[in-house]
A protein has these predicted regions:
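Transmembrane-helix boundary motif in ABC transporter permease subunits
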Residues: 64-94, 111
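N-terminal signal-anchor transmembrane alpha helix
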Residues: 2-26
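C-terminal transmembrane helix and the adjacent membrane-cytosol boundary/short C-terminal tail
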Residues: 84, 172, 176, 218-249
Length: 249
């Protein structure tokens, strides 16, 4: 509870300052709504079912994109970590792919894959791929040589070395990449939805914009923040669960 106290206090201070600013600044509600207006719009969207539905669609896109991106990044990262020659061949292309903003190719992906959930999942996976890939390579290569020598002296099989040495030793770095990828996956889903979608939080953002329903825009933005924080928190829980040994004296 002590860890949450500063967060709660800072959040309440922000909301109070926001409310006072909208109350005395004279700015119209359609430009900057008050917290009470946003809360009322949130309750309305929850009651009519639109917010749970569209949030569920976006969350599904995020989770699927995260799974696909992490799986591909982990497999490719492990292969490149074990083969420096292959990394030298592929790394220029991988780096070049990161020089192209995903938002620039998102319209192409929507044209090729359609405006359904598939294009959003692919966009999510592309954004997640690189940070997890890099951390996988770094994590696997950070395994001490002495551990390989020890397992070799015990005549350990390749699978035993993988699961008993490489996975545990590289897990801290890998989870660090997953933390980044989890939050970036939210951006991926929204980029796809803003390009073309008839459902999801990105659709609600555009709908609120077109209808000058600014409180709805704020509701959608805060839901995206909540999703990002939730995913980040899940990864932190995984770190606490699997990396307990790091905190031991």
């Amino acid at each position: 509870m002590k860890k949450l106290t500063p967060i709660i206090l800072s959040t309440l201070t922000f909301i109070l300052g926001w409310h006072l600013f909208t109350l005395y600044s004279g700015i119209p509600n359609f430009i900057l709504p008050s917290p009470l207006s946003v809360w009322a719009r949130f309750l309305k969207a929850v009651n009519d079912g639109s917010l749970p539905y569209h949030t569920g669609i976006t969350l599904l896109e995020i989770v699927l994109g995260l799974i696909v991106g992490v799986l591909f990044a982990t497999v490719v990262g492990y292969i490149l970590a074990k083969s420096r020659s292959l990394e030298k061949v592929l790394s220029p292309y991988l780096v070049a792919s990161q020089a192209i903003p995903v938002i620039a190719i998102a319209p192409l992906l929507v044209i090729w894959l359609g405006d359904g959930i598939l294009s959003k999942v692919v966009i999510c996976a592309l954004i997640v791929f690189f940070p997890v890939l890099v951390n996988t390579i770094v994590g696997v290569r950070a395994v001490p040589t002495a551990l390989y020598d020890l397992m070799g002296s015990l005549h350990a099989s390749r699978s035993q070395i993988l699961w008993k040495v490489e996975v545990p030793a590289s897990l801290p770095v890998f989870l660090g990449g997953l933390r980044i990828g989890a939050t970036l996956s939210v951006i991926g889903a929204i980029v796809g939805e803003l390009v073309s979608a008839e459902q999801g939080l990105g659709f609600l953002l555009q709908l609120g914009d077109f209808q000058y329903d600014t409180p709805m825009v704020f509701v959608a933005v805060f839901m995206l923040i909540a999703l990002a924080l939730m995913l980040y928190g899940i990864v932190r829980l995984l770190e606490n669960r699997f990396l307990k040994w790091q905190n031991k004296p």
